[in-house]
Amino acid sequence: MKKDIHPDYHPVVFKDAGTGHSFLTKSTATSDRTVEWEDGNEYPLIVVDVTAESHPFWTGAQRVMDTAGRVEKFNQRFGAMARRKKKNA
């Protein structure tokens, strides 16, 4: 491999802003903020809005979108315009 062309890949702590859950992984992301981890070492800290701890899909709080209702609502709003354009064409 060529030297000095690869990004710095190092341990980083990611913290979920909503739940406070933190986990240590490797990343190329960097931060000026640091945190002392359970092993006694200090790592860069990156605070994120959503992780697997808070995302609705992974927590089981996922809701199903009513796409049929959304299509009907769209047609109610803009369907008349499309019908008028077809008549004029």
From Swiss-Prot:
Signal peptide range in chain numbering: none
Keywords associated with the record: Ribonucleoprotein, Ribosomal protein
Cellular component aspect of the GO annotation: ribonucleoprotein complex; ribosome
Domain of life: Bacteria
PANTHER family according to UniProt: 50S RIBOSOMAL PROTEIN L31, CHLOROPLASTIC (PTHR33280), LARGE RIBOSOMAL SUBUNIT PROTEIN BL31C (PTHR33280:SF1)
Subunit structure as annotated in this protein's UniProt entry: Part of the 50S ribosomal subunit.
Family, per entry: Belongs to the bacterial ribosomal protein bL31 family. Type B subfamily.
Protein name: Large ribosomal subunit protein bL31B
Organism: Corynebacterium aurimucosum (strain ATCC 700975 / DSM 44827 / CIP 107346 / CN-1) (Corynebacterium nigricans)
